[in-house]
């Protein structure tokens, strides 16, 4: 589960390495984010020459969580790290590559561009 002040690894080549969650979008009572949820975050670490810089406020979608998620068929999936992909206003990724696997739940949230760029969908 991702909550306010959580730090996430960035799984794309937008220039950010680590982000810190400011807000989870989706209503005032939403406390935690899971796979496929959109968050507002600030960049804490960035690579030089990237699209985003340290201190930028960005929107991102959660693609991997340690907490995991249950699926309707009864299976359960969780990852070794918490990771997100930085997105623009039109839900398209700011980077051109996605690193590591992403969950199949992103298809339900209309993040098909992220799913198509990912090397593996679990």
Curated annotation (Swiss-Prot):
Superkingdom of the source species: Bacteria
Keywords for the protein's UniProt record, in alphabetical order: Ribonucleoprotein, Ribosomal protein, RNA-binding, rRNA-binding
InterPro entries registered for this protein in UniProt: Ribosomal_uL14 (IPR000218), Ribosomal_uL14_bac-type (IPR005745), Ribosomal_uL14_CS (IPR019972), Ribosomal_uL14_sf (IPR036853)
Gene Ontology process terms (BP): translation
PROSITE patterns in UniProt: RIBOSOMAL_L14 (PS00049)
GO molecular function list: large ribosomal subunit rRNA binding; structural constituent of ribosome
Family matches, as Gene3D superfamilies: Ribosomal protein L14
GO cellular component: cytosolic large ribosomal subunit
Pfam families in the cross-refs: Ribosomal_L14 (PF00238)
SMART domains found in the cross-reference section: Ribosomal_L14
CDD domains according to UniProt: Ribosomal_uL14
Similarity comment text for this entry: Belongs to the universal ribosomal protein uL14 family.
Assembly information from the UniProt record: Part of the 50S ribosomal subunit. Forms a cluster with proteins L3 and L19. In the 70S ribosome, L14 and L19 interact and together make contacts with the 16S rRNA in bridges B5 and B8.
Xref: PANTHER family: 50S/60S RIBOSOMAL PROTEIN L14/L23, LARGE RIBOSOMAL SUBUNIT PROTEIN UL14M
Cited function: Binds to 23S rRNA. Forms part of two intersubunit bridges in the 70S ribosome.
Protein name as catalogued: Large ribosomal subunit protein uL14
Gene name in the database record: rplN
